[in-house]
Structure formats: C-alpha cells, structure tokens
C-alpha cells in the first residue's frame, strides 16, 4: 500500500522523468476538484493529508535503502503541484476575487461543454512553473533538497509549490495569460 502511495498509483514507475509524470498525475485531481467546486480550505486539508501520507510512505519505502530520494517516489511532486494551484482555488472560492479577477482576467467555466483556453493556459503555466522550480531548485528549495530524510523529500517540493503559487498569483493578478 505504501508503494502505491509513494509512487502515486505507480505513476512514479514510468520512465523517463518519473517526477514529471508524477506532476502530470496530480493534474486530473485538480481538474476534478475544480469541477466539484472544492473550496481552497479543503484543497489545503487534502494536500496536508496527502503530505502526511507521503511522508509516511516515503519513510517506509526508503527504509534500509541507500538513496534517500528515489526517483520513483513522486508523491512529493503531487503535493507540490497541488500547492501551485492554491491561488486559483482562492480566486474560485472567494466571491470578491471571483467577480473581479475571474471576469476580467480569465473565464473559468469548468462545467460548460467548451472550456476556455484560459483554464488550459493556467494548467500549463502551473505545471511549467512547478517543474521549473522543482528542477532548478533556487534557495531555499536547494537547502530543503539537502535534508536527507523523508521529510526533506517532501519539503523541497512543498517549497517549489509555494514559489510556483506565488508566481501564478502574479500571473493571474496582472492578467498575463490574457
């Protein structure tokens, strides 16, 4: 069961670039969360639960192994990618932001038969931002990446998600996708 969680439904076993596959594996869940109009608070609660499960799964999966962050463990990418989408959920969960930013910057109508190009651009931008920060690892992400524990495996991707979320906030606020 822990391998199933650590590899995010075995997506982490895909080659090449299992981390990228893990990040992609997070996106259908974000899409579902948008369809069911999940509140940002619930997104953060679910992300926290998956973080704790991922931490435990990583602890068990790396026990008695020489490598502290095997490439097939991608649960950290999933949580980091979900954190990247936090600004979008803040906007869609908050009526004040929803009317001012959603109407003027992008048109999200996830329940319609035709999806706006803007939601595709938001997904693409979020994915690229997270992958960028996860690969480049500027400080303090690089510092967290050096923590050779299961917490460190998870934490560097949390920071990459936070950096990506900040960039996505700027992009959405200034309408840079329009």
Predicted features along the sequence, with ranges:
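Interfacial segments of multi-pass membrane proteins
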Residues: 24-37, 85-88, 168
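Alpha-helical transmembrane segments of multi-pass membrane proteins
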Residues: 31, 47-55, 89, 121-135
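Interfacial loop-to-helix junctions that mark the boundaries of transmembrane helices
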Residues: 37-43, 111-118
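Membrane-helix exit/interface motif
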Residues: 36, 53-65, 86-101, 105
């Amino acid at each position: 069961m822990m391998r199933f969680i650590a590899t995010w439904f075995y997506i982490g076993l895909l080659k090449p670039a299992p981390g990228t596959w893990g990040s992609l594996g997070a996106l259908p869940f974000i899409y579902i969360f948008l369809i069911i109009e999940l509140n940002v608070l619930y997104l953060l609660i679910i992300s926290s639960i998956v973080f704790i499960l991922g931490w435990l799964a990583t602890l068990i999966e790396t026990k008695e192994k020489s490598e502290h962050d095997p490439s097939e463990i991608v649960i950290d990418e999933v949580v980091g990618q979900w954190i990247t989408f936090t600004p979008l959920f803040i906007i869609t969960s908050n009526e004040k932001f929803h009317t001012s930013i959603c109407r003027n910057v992008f048109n999200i109508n996830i329940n319609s038969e035709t999806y706006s190009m803007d939601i595709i651009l938001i997904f693409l931008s979020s994915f690229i931002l997270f992958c960028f920060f996860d690969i480049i690892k500027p400080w303090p992400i690089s510092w967290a990446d050096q923590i050779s524990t299961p917490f460190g495996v998870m934490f560097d991707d949390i920071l990459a998600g936070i950096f990506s979320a900040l960039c996505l906030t700027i992009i959405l606020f200034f309408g840079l996708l329009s």
